[in-house]
Amino acid sequence: MATSPQTDPQHDDRPLPQDFETALAELETLVAAMEDGSLPLEQSLAAYRRGVELTRVCQERLAQAEQQVKVLEDGLLRPLDPRALDDE
């Protein structure tokens, strides 16, 4: 049996990674575990839920990077305010 992606199959209390690369790596690990078919149903559902959360982290980081590129393309070399993304 593959190692469990979490100890509690119903809920994962681990904090979400805040950087894109770590979130993507964890997501890829979860997908591989689910694809090999060795996880019991409850662990598969928990892995799916965690995967959705990780996907959201990745999407948010990509949106932030895209916004920074747009700012740089406009010649405005200033840090991006992440709160500006919440308004969209």
Swiss-Prot record:
Example of a GO biological process term: DNA catabolic process
Catalysed reactions listed for this entry: Exonucleolytic cleavage in either 5'- to 3'- or 3'- to 5'-direction to yield nucleoside 5'-phosphates
Localisation per UniProt entry: Cytoplasm
Pfam families, A to Z: Exonuc_VII_S
Gene3D superfamilies recorded: Exonuclease VII, small subunit (1.10.287.1040)
UniProt keywords, alphabetically: Cytoplasm, Exonuclease, Hydrolase, Nuclease
Primary subcellular site in the record, as a coarse category: cytoplasm
GO cellular component labels: cytosol; exodeoxyribonuclease VII complex
A GO molecular-function annotation: exodeoxyribonuclease VII activity
UniProt-listed Enzyme Commission number(s): 3.1.11.6
InterPro entries the record matches: Exonuc_VII_S, Exonuc_VII_ssu_sf
EC class name: hydrolase
PANTHER family: EXODEOXYRIBONUCLEASE 7 SMALL SUBUNIT
Summary of the function given for this chain in its UniProt record: Bidirectionally degrades single-stranded DNA into large acid-insoluble oligonucleotides, which are then degraded further into small acid-soluble oligonucleotides.
Membership in a protein family: Belongs to the XseB family.
HAMAP family according to UniProt: Exonuc_7_S (MF_00337)
Quaternary assembly: Heterooligomer composed of large and small subunits.
Listed name of the protein: Exodeoxyribonuclease 7 small subunit
Source organism of the structure: Bordetella petrii (strain ATCC BAA-461 / DSM 12804 / CCUG 43448)
GN (gene name): xseB
